[in-house]
Regions:
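Conserved helix-turn-beta segment of the N-terminal RecA-like "Helicase ATP-binding" lobe
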Residues: 2-6, 111-136
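Interdomain "pre-motor" coupling segment immediately N-terminal to P-loop NTPase/helicase cores
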Residues: 2-51
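Conserved pre-motif I regulatory segment
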Residues: 24, 46-82
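Walker A/P-loop
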Residues: 77-100, 105
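Hydrophobic positions in the central parallel beta-sheet of the AAA+
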Residues: 81, 106, 144-146, 165
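The conserved Walker
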Residues: 85, 110, 194
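Inter-Walker segment of RecA-like/P-loop motor cores
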Residues: 122-157
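SF2 helicase catalytic motif II
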Residues: 148-196
């Protein structure tokens, strides 16, 4: 069964864009978007298989600006943080990772973004991030940063390793590769960051 709905367009001549809300992963198992529990028929049994993978984070070394602190204080579960360029999404995302206390996978779509995240991890926590990509496959750090393509190729090795996933530039999540990484992962928390 699939549930879809049309997104209204501004131009009545444009075809409607469709959003797929429910997909069959395999017999007896469906995938729903986060926050759409209203789509689950009453006769379905919900089995939550999300994983907690607690780790000890070093102390976060910096103070958040008030707008960042407001977001940080609000987040207790899955969230999307949509803020302007230079607001400090990376910085705030790392603070939230520390707050949630779960082994964290940061998903990036470029090597420069992955490297930027690794520098920020070192700066704010004083630790080296694990890297997945460029011939490296390091899973032992509290925070691991990986490129989408490499994560996709290693999807079976990472699906039960993390308690939190942070999606940088999450507006790319509509790509099949990005979606597959999310849909097959057992992490407890999913945090999306976007500037668009």
């Amino acid at each position: 069964t699939e549930l879809t709905y049309a997104i209204p367009t501004h131009n009545p001549l444009d075809p409607p864009q469709m959003i797929k809300n429910m997909g069959l992963i395999r017999n007896g198992l469906i995938s729903l978007p986060i926050g759409r529990m209203d789509l689950i028929p009453d006769h379905y049994e919900i089995i939550d298989k999300r994983l907690n993978v607690p780790v000890d984070f070093p102390e976060f070394k910096f103070e958040l600006r008030q707008s960042q602190k407001d977001v940080y204080d609000e987040i207790e579960d899955n969230a999307i943080i949509n803020a302007w360029v230079s607001w400090g999404k990376t910085f705030t995302g790392l603070a939230i990772a520390g707050k949630l206390g779960q082994k964290t996978l940061v998903v990036t779509h470029t090597v420069p973004l992955r490297n930027q995240w690794a520098k920020e991890v070192k700066k704010v926590f004083g630790i080296e991030a694990g890297i997945i990509g460029s011939g490296r496959f390091e899973l032992d750090a509290p925070i691991v940063i990986g490129n989408t393509q490499t994560l996709y190729r290693n999807i079976d090795k990472i699906r039960k390793e993390f308690g939190t996933i942070i999606l940088d530039e999450m507006h790319h999540v509509s790509s099949p590769t990005f979606s597959k990484i999310l849909d097959t992962n057992y992490c407890r928390y999913k945090i999306g960051l976007s500037g668009t």
